[in-house]
Amino acid sequence: MTATQKAPWFAGKHALVVGMARSGTAAARLLLRHGATVRAIDRRRREDLSSEAMTLEGRGVEVRCGTMDASALEGCDLVVASPGVPADLPLFREAERRGIPIAPEIELGFAVARAPTDRKSVV
């Protein structure tokens, strides 16, 4: 897959990124690059987010600040959890109840990483 090709796992999906620190911001960029529609939420206030996180709005990301409300799950196919976000967040329980998959941010890298073996086995 070249840099301009889109990962079929994300193309056309609606993803919610929970937590907008470095990892969440990077996850949102990766999802955008691979054709997903992205919404991002963070419990911090808008003025407390990094300028890098806020530039995502200009790229089409819907950024919601100061809340972790379950309404952010509307229309989502995937929830991406940033590493610093507590796993017992009520939002995650609601996503599970709705049957929306939750992936740690690092799994996005595994989904798009090229690791060809050229038919060699790995032991």
Write out the residue ranges for each language-model feature.
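N-terminal leader/targeting and accessory segments in enzymes
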Residues: M1-L108
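Walker A (P-loop) phosphate-binding motif
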Residues: E105-V123
